[in-house]
Amino acid sequence: MKTYTKADFMTDLMAGIIVGIVALPLAIAFGIASGVSPEKGIITAIVAGFIISFLGGSKVQIGGPTGAFIVIIYGIIQEYGIDGLMVATMMAGVLLILLGIFKLGTVIKFIPYPIIIGFTSGIAVTIFTTQIADIFGLDFKGEKVPGDFIGKWILYFHHFDTVNWGNVIVSVVSVFIIAITPKFSKKVPGSLVAIILVTVGVYCLKMYGGITCIDTIGDRFSIKAQLLEAAVPALDWEAIKNLFPVAITIAVLGAIESLLSAAVADGVIGDRHDSNTELIAQGIANFVSPIFGGIPATGAIARTMTNINNGGKSPVAGIVHAVVLLLILLFLMPLAQYIPMACLAGVLVIVSYNMSGWRVFKGLLKNPKSDVAVLLITFFLTVIFDLTVAIEVGLVIACVLFMKRVMETTKISVITDEIDPNNESDLEVHEEHLMIPQGVEVYEINGPYFFGIATKFEEIMSRLGDRPKIRIIRMRKVPFIDSTGIHNLTTLCEMSQKENIHIILSGVNEKVHKVLEKSGFYELLGEENICSNINEALEVATREIAEINAK
């Protein structure tokens, strides 16, 4: 910020004003779709938006409520009420802060792409499903809307004879306006244009045409200007235990979406965000937002891109966006009561379409079968069950896939005759050829020695079926070893000692050396059997063979 100029401030000011105006209809739509009042959506955009811009690790990230949280929030409110939502969001905030403090921001980026697309596509389908009632103006006659996907569609079909064609027309017109606006202006958001035009049109029809069948926000909510008021929810240990899985879902989804948004922004502006700082900011935002009546928030790709496209260069634009929304909440909020519910449904239809990434989804179906299986499992779990189940299963799948790929990259080879220097990439071998004495086997490990490959040694040795006098384990290309790997080596050493087979380690790097030394493995093996390179290891083996043969 040392080179920040007045011109930069004016650019950020204009970008912030535009983003604030763009964020207004989305905040209202996301709030209502989540099962809370429109004010709560705007409060979230104000509080979380300010904190994420002020403390975040990205210069241009815009935070606030997003479509990804609609399904989760709605489900929490149905089961635990508003207080449960507040507690779950604050817990998620703490989890996000911990992720950032322990520098796990980069780990989030390793979640496989098919899982992310499965999540987002599933969420898109679910958001679209939640808007069917408002698109068609269905009257459920007081019947409670089920939280699950299949239950919703059964209810819709049972009450499809109550279609309000006025709502249908408003929804179609709204979608049409949003779709064609970019052809006339890339900077003016279609959602804002649609809400202004449709709201004015419906108001005129109501006032001068006597048409009152189209539902508006004011028909369902009491809208008023208000100051931000702080209130801490009552904390109950039983509720905390029950809400912990949901909090994990909010935290993981928030982390994925915010870091994905920041990464997209980096690609456009040529910058690099700090993942861990961003997670800490997201965590603080989600901890503070519920205190003022907000809902879960994260980085929003659409608003972030609007910020960039309108010249936003620094966090000032995001702060201005929050201030603009605060002014709207204080002075213009009563006007929101005239916005038709079907128009907001049209906005969310476009949001769900953009979120679906159907072209990417279709492209991933051509990938290897394992990727396709992961994609479809995550997608259908998100749609048919809920996002909590999908994320839990998705993370398990991500871990399994990661372990599988690491296992595939770790190789163990056996050399029984000679080592060719032409095959050595690190110049460890200083001779023309190193002959391996009779009765000696050299095992070369290339990759991490962790629980996933610990049994490979046993498989290779049982396959060879012989019993050499000495085994040299060459570990120059082992970057790390875990407790299972240490246990495997210890067991191998103990079994070998019982069978009078000598074990020698070669080329252990400093990091692995410290771990093995700390574990007590070297006391079992003996310091004399730890060699810095293969030359030294073969010299020790040659002497040992000579002593064995002399007996």
Language-model segment annotations:
Residues 220, 442-444, 530-531:
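Conserved beta-strand scaffold positions in the cores of enzyme catalytic domains, especially
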Residues 73, 153, 457-461, 537, ...:
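Generic hydrophobic alpha-helical segments
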Residues 63, 505-506, 531:
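Active-site-adjacent beta-strand anchor residues
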Residues 1-417, 421:
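Transmembrane helical cores of multi-pass ion-transport proteins
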Residues 15, 175, 179, 455, ...:
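Short, contiguous clusters of charged residues that form electrostatic/catalytic patches at enzyme active sites
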Residues 524-540:
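Short acidic-hydrophobic, aromatic-tinged amphipathic segments that line or gate anion-handling sites
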Residues 354-524, 542-550:
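The feature marks cytosolic C-terminal regulatory regions of anion transporters and related permeases
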